[in-house]
Amino acid sequence: MSKEEVLEFSGIVTELLPNAMFRVKLENDHEIIAHTAGRMRKNRIRVLAGDKIMVEMTPYDLTKGRIIYRYK
């Protein structure tokens, strides 16, 4: 998928789920399920409940996303 087709949103992690999945509340009050991007796993960036993050989503499935950045 090309980078132009990806939607990016800010959100807050509300719950940690099994298999490195997270429940995220987006800034537009939608809740999605997200997993960490491979680059974040490789650099061992921890994501905890309450963290402010950036999520990228495909326009084809707006219920799932990938966490690409954790704000400091």
UniProtKB/Swiss-Prot annotation:
- Transmembrane stretches in the record are none
Domain (S1-like) ranges: 1-72
User: What InterPro entries does the annotation carry?
Assistant: NA-bd_OB-fold, RNA-binding_domain_S1_IF1, TIF_IF1
Extract the PROSITE patterns matched here.
Answer: S1_IF1_TYPE
Per UniProt, the keywords (alphabetical) are: Cytoplasm, Initiation factor, Protein biosynthesis, RNA-binding, rRNA-binding
One cellular component term from this protein's GO annotations in UniProt: cytosol
**Quaternary structure and interacting proteins, as annotated:** Component of the 30S ribosomal translation pre-initiation complex which assembles on the 30S ribosome in the order IF-2 and IF-3, IF-1 and N-formylmethionyl-tRNA(fMet); mRNA recruitment can occur at any time during PIC assembly.
Upper lineage is: Bacteria, Pseudomonadati, Pseudomonadota, Alphaproteobacteria, Hyphomicrobiales
UniProt entry tagged with the keyword Metal-binding: no
GO MF, any single term: translation initiation factor activity
Instruction: Tell me the compartments it is located in.
Output: Cytoplasm
Endpoints of the signal sequence: none
Protein family membership: Belongs to the IF-1 family.
**HAMAP family membership:** IF_1 (MF_00075)
> What functional role does this protein have?
One of the essential components for the initiation of protein synthesis. Stabilizes the binding of IF-2 and IF-3 on the 30S subunit to which N-formylmethionyl-tRNA(fMet) subsequently binds. Helps modulate mRNA selection, yielding the 30S pre-initiation complex (PIC). Upon addition of the 50S ribosomal subunit IF-1, IF-2 and IF-3 are released leaving the mature 70S translation initiation complex.
What the entry lists under SUPFAM superfamilies is as follows: Nucleic acid-binding proteins
Primary location: cytoplasm
The entry's protein name is Translation initiation factor IF-1
* NCBIfam families named in the record: infA
Q: Which organism is it from?
A: Bartonella henselae (strain ATCC 49882 / DSM 28221 / CCUG 30454 / Houston 1) (Rochalimaea henselae)
